[in-house]
Amino acid sequence: MATLYPKPKRGQKIIFNEEGEGTIDTKPQGVMFDPGVPWYNIPLPELHEDKKFVNVDHVSELETRGLLLLKEDSERFSETLGHGTADKRMLQTLISSGTTSDRISALTLLVQESPIHAVKALETLLSICSKKSRNEATQAITTLKDLFIGGLLPDRKLKYMKQQSCLGSKNVTDKHLMVWAFESFLKSFYFKYIQIIEALSFDALLFVKSQMVSTIYDLLKAKPEQEQNLLKLLINKLGDKENKIASKASYSILQLEASHPAMKLVITKEIERFIFAPSTSRTSCYYTLITLNQTVLTHKQVDVANLLIEIYFVFFTKLLFALEKEEVADAPTLEKKSLQSDSKNKKSQKRKKDEDLRKEAEENVNSRVISAVLTGVNRAYPFAEVNSEKFDKHMNTLFAITHTASFNTSVQVLMLIFQASASRDFISDRYYKSLYESLLDPRLTTSSKQSLYLNLLYKSLIIDNNIPRVRAFIKRMVQVSAWQQPPLVTGLFHVMHQLVIATTALRSMFTNAEIHDFDGDEEEVFKDVEEDDVSEDQKVDSDKDGKLSDKQSHSAYVVGNVSVSTKKEHLSYDGRKRDPQYSNADGSCLWEIHPFLNHFHPTVSLLAKSLVYGEKILGKPNLSLHTLNHFLDKFAYRNPKKSAAARGHSIMQPLAGGLSKGYVPGSTYSGVPMNSEQFTSKKQEEIPVDELFFYRFFNDKYIKGKQARKTKVDRDEEGEIDEDEVWKALVDSKPQLEMDEEESDFDSEEMDKAMTDMGSDSEQSADENDNESMASEEKPMFSDEENLSEIAHSEDEFDDTVDFFEDENDLLPFNETDDEEEIQTVDHSETHSHKKKKRKAIKDLPVFADAESYAHLLEN
C-alpha cells in the first residue's frame, strides 16, 4: 500500500532515506541553510583545531568572503520565501510605508523566519532603536531583547571571526565562513545594541531609565554574552539620581544573585569597584551597601563573605576620615558668622536655611550608611574565615580612630568593633576599657548620638559575665549623671534598671554597705633577714595600668635581725583605674544615687526611687520626651495630628513603637488635651510624673476660677437683698411711690441720658480694672504663696475678671453654639431694666424721711 505524503509547498521537496521513509525538506531550493534550524545548531563538517597563526589580512579576507556568501544566500531566500504572493507584498508594504509599530512587527517576522538570512532586518531594527522618539526607541529595544532571549543568541558567548580556533584549517568550507561571519556580525551588532541601552539609561525621563534597567536585568539573567558590560551598567545605576531607579537596580542585582548564585563573587567584585570610585556619592554608597548586606550567604561561600568583610572595613575607615574632613570644612569662619548674624539680609537668611537643610540631609544619609555597614558586618562575619592577623589589623585601626576622632565617630567605631567581636564570640578587655573611658568624655553631653551610645552600652554590658566590671560601669554611670541633662540621665537609669533585672547580683549595690580599706585585717609576717636582701623598705610591683599585683600593698621594717612585713589588701573602690574590672567596684555601695531621689526633674526622681526600692519601671525610654523643647511644646495647644501612614517592610527601616508613637505636644498619651476639664478631673494617681506639673497648674487655676465666680455671685446676691429691704422700707413710709410711671412727672429722656453717662463711666472703670488684672497675670509661673493670694484677692475685687475655664471655646477649637451665653445675655438685660426702674423711683424720694421707718435697719 502506497504511503501518502502531504503535498510540499513551492520550493520544497520530499527526501527519501535508505529505508524508504520520506521527509519534507523545508529548506528552499538554492538556499544553503535550513531556516527551521537555529543558526548555532546548523550541522557543519568537523574541523580539527589548528593553532597555526593566521594573518590579520587573511582573516579580514575570509570574513568579507563569508559576508558576501551570506548576502547572496539571503537574496535567494527572500526570492523563494515560503509566503504567498499577497503575504510577501504585504510585508514589503509594511516595511516601506507602514507605521513604526507595523514596521517593527514585520521586521520581527522576518528575523523569526530565518535569523541568519535577516541581517538587513536586524540593522533596520537597530536604526529604529536610535530614533529620538522615546516610545519608538523603547519599543524596538524591547523587541530586540525578546529576539535575543527567544533564540537569536546561544547559551554561550559569541566569537569574532579572528577568535575561531579552526580558522587556519585547510578543510574550511563556505558554510563555515558564512556561519562564522554571521556570528561575528551578531557579536558586533549586540555590542552596538548595548551602547544604545547605555545612552538611554541616562535619559531624563524616568520611565525610559526604568525600562533600560529591566532590559539589562533580563539580558543578564538569560544570556552570558556581554555579561561583564551589562553587569557594569546595572551596578552603575545604583548611583542614579532618582531613588526609584537606584532601588530598582539594587533589587535587580539581588534577583540576579538568586538566579545565578555562582555570580555572587563576580557581582561583589564589580560592586567593590563602584563603591570605591572617586565619583561615587554618599547616597550611591548607601544603596550599594544595602545591596551588599542583603546578599544571601552560605558556609560554602567563604570567599564572598571574606571579600564583604574587607569591603566593609576599608569603606568604614575611608568614610570616617572623610567625615572628619567635612567637619573641619564646615566649621563656621568669621565671614560665615557675620553673614549669619545679619538678620536683615534676606539672602543670607535663605542661604543659611538651605545650608541647614543640606547638613540635615547629609547627616541622615551618613547615619544610614554607617547603619548599613554595621548590619553587613553582623551578617557576613558568621560565614567568613578571617585570620587572626587580618582581624587584629582591622581592630588596631579602629581603636586608633576611637582615640583621635570626634565623639560621634568614636561611638560608631565602637559599634563596629562590638559587632565584629560579638560575631567571633569574643569581646576583648580593650573594648570595655575604651567604652569605660568614653563615659567620662565631656562631649557626651552635647552629642547627637546619645541614643546609639546608650544602646551600645546596654548591649555590651548585658552579655558581660564579669560582674565586678559591670558594677564599675554602673558606678561610673551614676557618677557622670551628676552633670548630665535629664534626657541622658533617664536613659542611663533605664540601662541600669535593665541590667539589675537581668543580673540579680547587682542588687547588692543598693542594699549592702560600702567596704573600706580599714575594714580588712592586717597580717604581720616575721622572718630572718638574709644577707643578700635588698635594703629597700618599700617595694611595690605594679603593672602598666597602675594596679597593684594581687590587689595588695606591702610595707616592711627591720627589728634587730628580724624582718617584719605587714600585708594589707585594698578593698575600697578606686574610680581612677583605666580597667573597670580592677576598680574594686564589687565591694562598693551605690551611694551616689542618693541626690537623684530629690532631683528637680520628676522622671529622674521616679527612676532613681524605682532603682533604690527595686520597683518596676514601665515603658520604654525616649530621650526626646524629657528635653526642654518638649516641655515647652506642651504649652502649644493644638488639635491632634492625623495617624501616621503605615511604614514599609524593608529590613533597613525601623518599626514604629514606644510610648512616643502618635504623641502630640500638649496632650497626654491618651490624646486628652491638658487644658481640658477631662484632664483635670482625673485622679492624681492616674497622671504620669512628667505631667503632674500641668495637672496641678490647671487644677489650681480651675479651683481659683470657681472660687472667684462664687464670690462674685454671692456679693451680687447680697447687694440685691440689701437694696430690696431699703426699697420696702421706703414704700412703707411713702405709699405714693407705688404710682404708675405715666403719672410721674419724671423726665425719662433725661434719666436715659444720665444712665448712658453712668454706663460710659462704668465701662471706663471696667477697662482700667481689666488692664490691672492683665498686668497682674503677667507674673512668673512659679511664684510664692503670698503673691498667689494677692492675685486671688485682686481677682475678687473686679467684676470683669476673665476665668481660665469660663469659656472652653477660648481653648479648644470646636464649633459649638453658645446657648448658655444667649440666656445669660437675656437675664442681664432684664436685671438691668429692673434696676433702671428702681433708680427712677429712688430719684423721686424726698430728701428727708421719718427715722421710725429705718429703725429696724439702724438696729442691725
Swiss-Prot record:
Keywords: Phosphoprotein. GO terms for cellular component: Noc1p-Noc2p complex; nucleolus; nucleus. It comes from the Eukaryota. Transmembrane segments: none annotated. Residues 334-360, 530-551, 708-798, 813-842 are annotated as: Disordered. The keyword Oxidoreductase does not apply. Residues 334-345, 536-551 have a biased composition (Basic and acidic residues). One of its GO terms (biological process) is ribosome biogenesis. The keyword rRNA-binding does not apply. InterPro entries: ARM-type_fold, CCAAT-binding_factor, CEBPZ/Mak21-like, EF_Hand_1_Ca_BS. Residues 716-725, 738-750, 813-824 have a biased composition (Acidic residues). The modification Phosphoserine is found at residues 744, 748. Belongs to the CBF/MAK21 family. This is Uncharacterized protein C4F10.09c. It comes from Schizosaccharomyces pombe (strain 972 / ATCC 24843) (Fission yeast).
